[in-house]
C-alpha cells in the first residue's frame, strides 16, 4: 500500500505541471506577442500616431514585463507627448532590465540632459 501513495502523489504532480504548462503561454510566445506590439508601435509612431504607439508599447510591457526595448520605445513616446515623469520611469525600468544596453543609456542620458537643463519644462497630463 505504501507504494501506491507515492505513485498517486507523483501522478498528481505530473497532472498539475501539465495543466500549468498548457494553461499559460510560454515565454517565447509572450515575447513574440510583445515583439508584434512593439513593431506595430514603431509603424504607427513613424506615421505620427504617438498615442496609438504608446498603447501598443504599454501592451508589450504588459505581455512581457522584461522587454527592455519596449520600455525604451515607451519612454521615447512619453517624452514626445510631454509625459516626462512617465518617460523617466520607463527609461529607468529599461536600464534596470538591460543595464549594458548602450542605446537605452544614450537615450536616457540625452533625456536627462535636456530635461534637467530646461527644468522649467511643463509636463502634459
Residue ranges and their predicted role:
Residues 34-35, 68-69, 102-103:
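Helix-start (N-cap) detector for alpha-helical repeat units in TPR-like alpha-solenoids
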Residues 46-47, 80, 110-117:
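Register position in tetratricopeptide repeats
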Residues 59-62, 95-96:
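Conserved structural position within tetratricopeptide repeats
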Amino acid at each position: 500500500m505504501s507504494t501506491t501513495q507515492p505513485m498517486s502523489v507523483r501522478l498528481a504532480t505530473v497532472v498539475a505541471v501539465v495543466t500549468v504548462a498548457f494553461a499559460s503561454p510560454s515565454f517565447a510566445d509572450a515575447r513574440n506577442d510583445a515583439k508584434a506590439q512593439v513593431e506595430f508601435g514603431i509603424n504607427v509612431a513613424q506615421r505620427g500616431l504617438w498615442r496609438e504607439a504608446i498603447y501598443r508599447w504599454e501592451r508589450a510591457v504588459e505581455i512581457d514585463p522584461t522587454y527592455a526595448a519596449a520600455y525604451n520605445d515607451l519612454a521615447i513616446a512619453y517624452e514626445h507627448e510631454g509625459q516626462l515623469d512617465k518617460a523617466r520611469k520607463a527609461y529607468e525600468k529599461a536600464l534596470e532590465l538591460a543595464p549594458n544596453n548602450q542605446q537605452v543609456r544614450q537615450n536616457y542620458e540625452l533625456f536627462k540632459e535636456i530635461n534637467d537643463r530646461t527644468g522649467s519644462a511643463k509636463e502634459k497630463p
